[in-house]
């Protein structure tokens, strides 16, 4: 008599199901772990940047204050607003599916809400770099980097070099020259490590330990964060396939330095709201939303090197 086949036996048994969902949609961004967030009242944060300092003069006995540039000029400022926007999506789960397909450690509603929350976090991280400030987007680092804060990479771009990194860090001055981070795409980080190996005998083991205990590479004591949300399809002077390296500072709570994420005081972080039953179908709706934004307090707290070809 023939033995039972695997196909037939499978009809009488179930495979073991692992609880949860294994992540397969991943974009590395080590920088997000250290980005500070500031809660604000209202939907916008206003702050003033120095434009022109009030002038002073060197004076001796009998010097009078008269005429232009005689110590009487007033300071001027530029008012800046960083607005909150909303990242949101609805998780809808059919009542029958929730009632009959939520065993084995996989609650259908919880899985869908978790997926929407992950999407919200990924959307923010993308906007942190690529947001253009138009429509409902907030301005990201590419948009926020001032024209005078760009390191020299030539008319058609350049490969990464130690000289570019040095100039990039020199442009960050709002904390008296302290630089809190360098961030680049994985492709550029590999090229940076190749530079170190080419030195011959140089160690590529310079690392910085983060508050959570993880270690990241470092340059001149400044942590380098891999961030794969940084595009590698930019164009400079006809050269395609370029990318950008950023360096800057993180705000320390004083609202005077570098960058900080923004969120609403009364609804900080990602919120999950039970909207209720759909009016015309057997669906329960949960709304996942995040009131968020990004502020660059000092323009001297962000610098970039665009046109990097590797």
Model-flagged regions — what are they?
Residues 1-242, 249-310:
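Flexible, glycine/threonine- and acidic-rich loop/arm segments that mediate assembly and lattice contacts
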